[in-house]
């Protein structure tokens, strides 16, 4: 798949923050109408101290049949800095994206979207590169305030930055911690909530796109795929 190259990656942290502040102005929070046919999940892991592994899994929806899996392993040069995840993981994701043959209608990232100090988590940032609707799904809160949803499957609450709604907190599995969902690009809060609920099977905490992508990253790390 093609993508737009919007900036250099070899930037010091202070310049990376400036890039984020400029790119956030380009984000479009729009409703996603209808149902997707193909959904992608993205997961990144770090087999070594300076080595990263990116996996993209494309699924048919609503069957969640796996249609394609691509991966990219390479050197990581940007340091781990909260809020600058895209500069650490983005280049590997884009190299994996180049290998993809099946164009997804929606891409789900293991990370943040709008729920970010500068409103530009990895789902938003990469959404601008690929110009496809994206959603960020995180296992923990990076930014924002919320009221804990009740311990009932599919209960939820909004995630706020002041009075602005920037995402939602969804209890996808009873007895488990909630997940933090926020729109990336070409997506809005209500659509991301609706889709992630639909992408998460009963008894699972994590939606199928990123859950399956994570399984493949673990298999690749162990040399089983």
From Swiss-Prot:
Gene Ontology cellular component list: cytoplasm
Cofactor requirements of the protein: Mg(2+)
Subcellular location: Cytoplasm
Main location: cytoplasm
InterPro entries hit by this protein: Endonuclease-V, Endonuclease_V-like
Protein's GO biological process: DNA repair
Pfam family of the protein (one): Endonuclease_5
Site entry: Interaction with target DNA: 80
Highest taxon in the source lineage: Bacteria
Stretch list, region Interaction with target DNA: 139-141, 214-221
Physiological role: DNA repair enzyme involved in the repair of deaminated bases. Selectively cleaves double-stranded DNA at the second phosphodiester bond 3' to a deoxyinosine leaving behind the intact lesion on the nicked DNA. In vitro, can also cleave single-stranded substrates with inosine, double-stranded DNA with apurinic sites, or DNA sites with uracil or a mismatched base. When present in molar excess, two protein molecules can bind to the same DNA substrate and effect cleavage of both strands (in vitro).
Classification via NCBIfam families: endonuc_V_Ttgales (NF041102)
Stored PANTHER family: ENDONUCLEASE V (PTHR28511:SF1)
Protein name: Endonuclease V
